[in-house]
Amino acid sequence: MVVTSNADRICTGITSSNSPHVVKTATQGEVNVTGVIPLTTTPTKSHFANLKGTKTRGKLCPKCLNCTDLDVALGRPKCMGTIPSAKASILHEVKPVTSGCFPIMHDRTKIRQLPNLLRGYENIRLSTHNVINAEAAPGGPYIVGTSGSCPNVTNGNGFFATMAWAVPKNNNNKTATNPLTVEVPFICTEGEDQITVWGFHSDDETQMVKLYGDSKPQKFTSSANGVTTHYVSQIGGFPKQAEDGGLPQSGRIVVDYMVQKSGKTGTITYQRGILLPQKVWCASGRSKVIKGSLPLIGEADCLHEKYGGLNKSKPYYTGEHAKAIGNCPIWVKTPLKLANGTKYRPPAKLLKE
């Protein structure tokens, strides 16, 4: 190829304009380049969403209206329903709210943690059978107590499905008793964890004598999976309290739970006022849990505790560093850029003779 020109001299080189792109390199420090691809984004806060490609759990029982997660976990009447399986869960109650029904001394035990424990499982179901025959338990015979403060689906007196309020049936066994022990068998399917809820009731001296024949503080112990917990009941001193428009109650209940691993038996040692386990939670698999808020709107690649639902537009992000689950960008302290051009060189100058 022949090139002709009237110019005094032909110069070859890189044609370039002023470059606004600066990248930091490992060997040469800051370098101007002709082009870059941004690799980071700084998210803005958004609502939480369903995680793409998997089921995301918000409330434990979405169809249980006007129920807290603790209501569902305890089996409160009118709060019974199916808990959908989920591989990801939103911890929307960092400190779960109280349950209604009968007044509970929530802060004496770890019972507030029960909804969050259940949330950490992929599959959760309530057993169809009772784990203990409460009427025939040691220290009986018993009748199963109910309360007008805990109405069932027909608006009759009810109680939590996970527990049976064991009240001595007749005057012959309404007496003080030495500690009694009942075994809690494993009734879930092999490979599942069994979460067994139990508790005890106490009242003022007059009501304790009327119900149980003993007004002294009662002792209770649970043991499962190497964990043993002891309680002593408080007698009296409670102001009357009503839950959700129910009858004012002078008594209180203390509720706890124990986790039984597959095939393992638990034990409960008790005196008067025991709330014996009934239906138990059978749980398996693991659900990734992240703190967030409801409702879940739409879908997102990633759920981030600080930013909510994120769609991954870049491989990295800057901003607040926090727990995230899903297909998430990686947190970096400073923005990253990928140079997709060449090192910037000033335009060549024509040489004059």
From Swiss-Prot:
Q: Which UniProt keywords apply?
A: Disulfide bond, Fusion of virus membrane with host endosomal membrane, Fusion of virus membrane with host membrane, Glycoprotein, Hemagglutinin, Host cell membrane, Host membrane, Host-virus interaction, Lipoprotein, Membrane, Palmitate, Signal, Transmembrane, Viral attachment to host cell, Viral envelope protein, Viral penetration into host cytoplasm, Virion, Virus entry into host cell
UniProt xrefs under InterPro entries = Capsid_hemagglutn (IPR008980), Hemagglutn_HA1_a/b_dom_sf (IPR013828), Hemagglutn_influenz_A/B (IPR001364)
Q: Which GO molecular function annotation, any one, does this entry have? A: host cell surface receptor binding
- Keyword Lyase belongs to the record: no
Q: Which GO terms describe its biological process?
A: fusion of virus membrane with host endosome membrane; fusion of virus membrane with host plasma membrane; symbiont entry into host cell; virion attachment to host cell
- Glycosylated residues: list them: 32, 66, 152, 173, 311, 340
Quaternary structure (record):
Homotrimer of disulfide-linked HA1-HA2.
Q: Any idea what this protein is called?
A: Hemagglutinin
What organism does this protein naturally occur in?
Answer: Influenza B virus (strain B/Ann Arbor/1/1986)
Its lineage reads: Viruses, Riboviria, Orthornavirae, Negarnaviricota, Polyploviricotina
